[in-house]
Amino acid sequence: MMSKSLIKAGLIAGLLMGAVQAQAASATLDKMKSSGAVTMGVRESSIPMSYTTGDSRFDGYHVEICRMILGDIKDKLGMSTLRINYQPVTSQNRVPLVQNGTVDIECGTTTNNTARAKDVGFANTLYVEEVRIAVKANSGIKSISDLAGKKVATTTGTTSVQLLRKHERANGVNFDEVFGKDHADSFLLLESGRADAFVMDGSILAGNIANSKNPKDYKIVGEVLSTEPIAIMVRKDDPEFKAAVNAAIAKIVANGKMPGLWNKWFLSPIPPKNIVVGLELSPATKNAWANLNDKPAEDYNKK
């Protein structure tokens, strides 16, 4: 016969587990309802995905999608208004800020990979990125093999850091890595001649080139170094909020909104300088819309 102490311990453990699960399942939605607000993590220089337009205003492809998502959730919660607080994040602090509750939903340029998925959750992907190389047009650099002995910039805290080292080992090409604190800083390293190349997501490269003083002075070259799903990030222990986000994403896709959003942010003049990024819709991104999923980058790069 089971002792009273064991029965009591089991009951307490069960109650605690139920309480934790209930709290975890509804934490973000309850916070939104009780406070009337939500905190969105945004980037400052990830044009056209997530960036500042000045005066503490933020916009971009992922930012607009997140506003649509939050609007849908607001309506489902029966709220008349929902205040969105914007919290700038960096490549270094974005994951910790989601983990500790400072940021409720991160709408930037974060790659969904298995390492990060141990700490945070990812919504279904609406943008599939290709990592490329940006150089000065007159550099003579055409591929990663031409980077031998060169200085190559990338942004601290991004997957491109590990990617560079992987390609360096695999191809026997030795180059010096230099790091920018954010994407604008990394591009400045290339612009000022302190780096010979900048390796990063193609959209970020194209956005920074379009935003530069002389866009014709730069070009994107070489092979695709990696294919990466860029996804909206949420807390790992809040499956109910992730489900609400994914339900809103499914509605946006079903209502045919995605092609218009792509044209607006990648193929049309965008604020504040009316630059045109000029990045065509890729088959991989189009497929992600047609087959919504939260697969990590490792699944995209299987040989």
Identify the meaning behind each predicted range.
Residues 29, 109, 117-126, 220-222, ...:
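A structural signal for short loop-to-beta-strand junctions that line the ligand-binding cleft
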